[in-house]
Amino acid sequence: MMSQEERAQLLVPRADFIKEFEQAFKRSLQSDAPVLSHALEHLQHSSGKHIRPIIVGLCAQLCAGQTSAQTLSAALVIELLHTASLIHDDVIDWSDTRRGQPTLNALYSNHQAVLMGDYVLSTAFLEIVSREHTPEMLRVVAQAGRNLSIGELMQLSLSKAHTYREEDYYAVVDRKTGALFEASAKLGALSVGATEEQVDRCGRLGQLMGRAFQLQDDLFDYDKLQDVGKPTGHDLVEGKVSLPLLYVLNHAAPTERDEIISYLQQPIEADSIDYLLRIARERGGIDYTERQIQHIHQEAIDLLRSFAPSSTRETLERFITLLGERQK
């Protein structure tokens, strides 16, 4: 776990960029329409740590030693796209809270929340048009949006089919979480005129960061001691089987596997959650997931070190480590 001092040091190289981003993000979430103003204000106060905009800025600095006006704009676009996707996810999942705050669909209704998500998405499009981003940057944003939709549809389909394969799990992760991390890294590189080879390396780096982030997020669902803005076992209740339990399913004896599947194929009650959390710990699912995070972390660090040495590279290395060690 990183100390508070190390976390503070990580903030220093990006402080000015993030301050500018936060001001731009706040301005973008404003409307004269009364029906929207309260909802947009709520989004401002319930936004997260802005991890994806940080990646945009760091990858720009990694490739060119500086950021540009397009870098800031790209960071705003990616965060607006991320925000819109979360609003729609909450509707799909019937979620009442996110990060400990009520969701828009809880405050209003599913119908209104969908339209509010569309408004935020349209705001991202307006930012793209107004800044005249390059065709390649437009393509990256559009592809990220498509991958988000594909990933969500895949997850819903797999949940209904009760399919439990690790390769399917990673396919969903790379399209949902990984899509925006990959796009963030690519946009950062493209915003400063990086070479095609640099853009590709940044994209792969972003994908690996997305995987590490999601696996760590999955572990939170199995830890009753963590306070991450959602109850323990929340994903299981929604029919989402993540890596800790997938590992157990794919290594269990036939009778035990059938028993686990029987729990997953019926409405999940408190006793069922306790059983599934316990079996994931006792059968090595938690340990396996932690090892996978370590492998992904090392691959990301090795890739990062293919870039020229710089203070930004050192910052990104600490940032990647923090993603795999964060507490929420």
Please annotate each region the language model reported:
Residues 1-328:
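All-alpha prenyltransferase/terpene-synthase fold signal
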